[in-house]
Regions:
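Low-complexity, small/polar and acidic-rich linker and loop segments
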Residues: 2-184, 198-206, 210-215
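Extended amphipathic alpha-helical scaffold segments
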Residues: 162-194, 416-438
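Short linear, low-complexity motifs centered on an aromatic residue
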Residues: 192-208, 443-456, 657-665, 763-777
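Long, charge-dense tracts
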Residues: 214-343
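Hydrophobic, often aromatic-rich secondary-structure segments at membrane interfaces
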Residues: 302, 306-426, 430-712
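Short hydrophobic helices that act as membrane-entry/anchoring signals
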Residues: 420, 427, 431-438, 634, ...
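Short low-complexity linker/loop segments enriched in small residues
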Residues: 654-777
Length: 855
């Protein structure tokens, strides 16, 4: 009896309890697997032998599937058990158990939690990957226009990865490093329950432009892939078209389900399914309640790697026609995507969505058992936040409801940033305060902070300094991503490339990008160097603050002994304790080495975010909730959230750390240190911004030494990231002429209001016989929103020589308005202009003695 007959009979036979020995699903799966093997083997073996071999291979394949399912079940149970242990160990600010807060901390970073969260783990896996790409990132890093350097060499990198010898030694080395990163991530994915096969002949990820693929029919797309000669010799090309070869290596493409080469018919079915998935944005692969497809994250991604290109030229031809175009971005995007999935797998097991629901059900059950209305309300809110955080973890909330309107509004936000954040660099001096507080908290020496930052900002040997930072596993977003610097003020956003390039140019030209990256590099290098300086000390001998910081990340004496026994990394005489060197130790069990590596990266990355506050998932969720782009509600929330990310992040980091410290004295010391440092740096930023606007510095103290409370109120808000709101302390309008309601609604709403006033408002005024001031309003809008108009070192010249003259041309009362504005600041704030509105040249120079009340 053949195995096929046994399978059919197994569906008819029953167990003693009356259930079938094989369920319908099991029988159908076994029959499908057998038939696929049989059809492939029949092409090269006689019927009896093909039947026997197909039976053997079917049995082996089904056995492997059972093993894989059981392995994933065990890993899933283990992840769920660990999640429960972690949330039960969590203590809130009062030192009490708090299950609702604890469960949220598994998804988004919470200063009170000592365990790892999915948000931080994503960054950990990203740092593990990019540290091998120092040469590639240094060579290909983005220029001031946001473009990739050496695009042609990136094509050589791809050719080398796919087996073509280009003769470009640097490209070969970069290709080997990138291939190693892809392989490391594949193996890590498989360790956590996945089953991604290794593609022989080299692998480079392919992305698909949905709109480009939609522009051709399914038949045309499959023909483009397979060539005009298709399954069974069927030629589907039009009679007038010349025959053309396909791009994929049909003979050597392996069916992941069978492990054998595809039959032409099966390959065509696979490509048909692939076309449907691309053009439907994966909707054809989705099932209700699943994670981006079939529910189990670990069982995904294997189908992405069955395409085997004939050669690198074939891949590049597809990429130019239907792919993501920019090869560097495709590679970095793949690393980011894999890092996201690896974080979810490590924290929540092979099926993260199931673990999420398990935790929510656990909270619901606890609420039912405790019969406490307040606790039940907290659980309800926590479960809603968990859903929101999970959408951020998976990136589901970035998909616009309407891609057309989502892109339109994202582009508008980019352009607004390019026209309004040109002087944000002057606000970034607050980083010196947060660096100071973060270093003190971790026990790191605070001497020379500014010098180290400026050394990294300097363009001298910029590539070498950056490559060192990457090798140390530090952030390199400014090299690999566009629009990374403004994310600390606006949050992460997806937008059209053209507007993103404009915004990115302003951030780089204004020095905000280099300042932000330099600050993060300086802190990370100092921390790793400080650890290296202390390897001669036992855990108990470490400085108190450093020891407490390490304990917060679950690094105790046992882990520290392993870390300090690791050979230090030497760079021109400077010693560093690198996570990579711990992971590469062959004398440690791999699981132990990887665990300590993760703890060290998690500590460095989290503390760096305290030193240079950046956007956070928790902050984005607080401001935007679970809204998605492309909808009215989502776009209104995106407008509201703009420029508010920094103060919210500050609240979720430093303020939360301060109130979470043990003992009232410790809380007071930390928070007072933070407040004084931020206010001092806020004062510096405010005075710099005033001088950049052409005004003399504002008096900080009167002649008799009394503090100017108007100034210090503004300085405190400036230091806390609320500089725009400082204007509302003493007036109804801010410096942009907006009221509190308009400012709170956000820049997009403000722009729409300006457009309405310029159009509908002027029409109404004209109809009523009133003066319209149309020309003045046009000039005002153009100067307010023109990209790069307020870059801090050019804004004053632009305003005086271009804007003011344009206003004079369209407004006969311009000079009178300019005089009123100068008198207003002198009367209300005691400030004169050193280069005032309407003046052709500076009348004075900034008088720094004004700061202390001297005239």
């Amino acid at each position: 009896m053949s195995l096929r007959e046994c399978i059919i009979n197994g569906g008819d036979e029953t167990n003693p309890d009356g259930t079938p020995k094989l369920s319908r699903e099991q029988r159908d799966e076994a029959l499908r697997t057998f038939d696929e093997y049989k059809s492939q083997l029949s092409l090269k073996l006689p019927e009896p032998e093909a039947d026997i071999e197909a039976g053997r291979m079917t049995f082996t394949a089904l056995e492997k599937k059972v093993r894989d399912r059981n392995r994933r079940k065990i890993m899933q149970l283990r992840a769920q058990k660990q999640a429960l242990l972690d949330i039960q160990s969590f203590r809130n600010i009062g030192g009490n158990e708090d299950l609702p807060l604890a469960a949220q901390a598994l998804f988004a970073k919470d200063e009170r939690a000592k365990f790892a969260d999915a948000e931080t783990l994503q960054t950990v896996y990203l740092r593990k990957a990019t540290r091998k790409l120092d040469k590639m990132l240094g060579s290909m890093r983005r220029n001031i226009l946001g473009g990739i350097r050496k695009k042609a060499q990136m094509e050589n990198v791809v050719r080398e990865m796919m087996g073509t010898d280009t003769g470009d030694v640097a490209a070969r080395e970069m290709g080997e490093a990138l291939a190693s990163v892809f392989e490391d991530q594949r193996l890590a994915f498989n360790r956590m329950g996945g089953s991604i096969g290794k593609l022989e002949g080299g692998y480079f990820p392919v992305t698909h432009d949905m709109m480009a693929v939609r522009s051709v029919s399914k038949d045309e797309w499959i023909q483009f892939m397979m060539g005009t000669e298709r399954a069974g010799g069927r030629d589907v090309s039009a009679p007038t078209k010349e025959a053309r070869p396909g791009l994929i290596d049909v003979e050597n493409m392996i069916d992941n389900e069978t492990g054998l080469p595809f039959t032409p018919q099966k390959l065509e079915i696979a490509l048909s399914n692939m076309y449907d998935a691309i053009t439907s944005n994966n909707a054809t692969r989705s099932k209700p309640g699943g994670f981006g497809g079939n529910g189990s994250l670990a069982s995904q991604r294997a189908d992405h790697r069955f395409i085997k290109w004939k050669n690198a030229d074939a891949f590049l031809e597809y990429n130019n026609q239907f792919g993501g175009k920019e090869l560097f971005d495709v590679a970095i995007g793949h690393i980011h995507s894999m890092s996201r999935d690896l974080a979810l797998l490590e924290r929540f097991g092979p099926n993260p969505a199931t673990t999420k629901r398990y935790l929510q059900q656990y909270l619901d059950r606890e609420a039912g058992l405790r019969k406490d209305e307040k606790f039940a309300d907290e659980v309800s809110k926590a479960n809603a936040k968990i859903d929101t955080f999970y959408e951020y973890n998976t990136g589901a909330n970035l998909a616009p409801i309407s891609s057309r309107w989502g892109n339109v509004f994202a582009g508008i936000r980019d352009l607004l940033q390019s026209g309004q954040l040109g002087s944000a660099f002057l606000s970034a001096f607050g980083d010196l305060a947060t660096q100071n507080v973060a270093r003190a908290s971790a026990g790191i020496p605070q001497i020379g902070t500014l010098t180290k930052i400026l050394r990294n900002v300097s363009p001298i040997q910029a590539t070498k300094k950056g490559e060192l930072a990457v090798r140390l596993g530090l952030v390199a977003d400014g090299w690999s991503q566009m629009a990374s610097a403004q994310a600390r003020f606006t949050g992460e956003m997806v937008s059209p490339e053209v507007t993103r390039r404009i915004s990115d140019f302003v951030m780089r030209a204004s020095l905000l990008s280099s300042w932000t990256q330099a600050g993060r590099w300086a802190f990370g290098q100092e921390f790793l160097g400080f650890l290296a300086d202390n390897v001669g000390r036992s855990f108990d001998e470490l400085p108190d603050n450093l020891r407490r910081t390490m304990q917060h990340y679950q690094i105790g004496s046992d882990k520290w002994d392993i870390m300090r026994a690791t050979e230090l990394y030497d760079y021109n005489g400077a010693k560093f304790l690198r996570a990579e060197d711990i992971a590469n130790r062959t004398d440690l069990p791999p699981t132990v080495a990887r665990s300590i590596e993760t703890d060290l990266i998690r500590m460095i990355e989290t503390e760096t975010n305290f030193a240079v506050p950046s956007s956070s998932m928790r902050g984005a969720a607080m401001l935007r909730g679970s809204s998605r782009p492309g909808s009215i509600g989502g776009e209104l929330l995106n407008s509201f959230a703009m420029y508010k990310q920094f103060p919210v992040t500050l609240m979720n980091t430093h303020l939360m750390r301060g109130v979470a410290r043990e003992g009232r004295l410790s809380k007071m010391v930390y928070l007072s240190h933070l407040m004084l440092a931020m206010t001092a740096m806020g004062a510096l930023s405010y005075q710099m911004k005033e001088m950049a606007k052409g005004r003399q510095p504002m008096e900080m103290f009167s002649e008799d030494g009394e503090p100017n409370m108007k100034f210090w109120g503004r300085a405190a808000l400036q230091g806390g990231g609320l500089g725009l709101y400082g204007d509302f302390l003493f007036s109804d309008l801010n410096v942009y002429g907006r009221g509190l309601a308009d400012q709170t609604a956000g820049p997009v709403v403000g722009l729409l209001s300006d457009v309405k006033n310029l159009t509908v408002g002027n029409v109404a005024e004209f109809a009523a016989g009133d003066d319209t001031n149309f020309g003045k309003e046009v000039v005002g809008m153009a100067s307010r929103y023109f990209p790069g108009n307020n870059i801090w070192y050019t804004r004053l010249a632009f305003e005086r020589l271009v804007r003011d003259n344009a206003i004079r041309y369209v407004d006969p009362k311009a000079n009178a308005r300019f005089r009123r504005l100068r008198r207003k600041y002198l009367k209300e704030y005691g400030q004169e202009y050193w280069w005032g509105p309407g003046e052709e040249a500076p009348r004075d120079r900034p008088r720094l003695q004004n700061i202390i009340g001297e005239r």
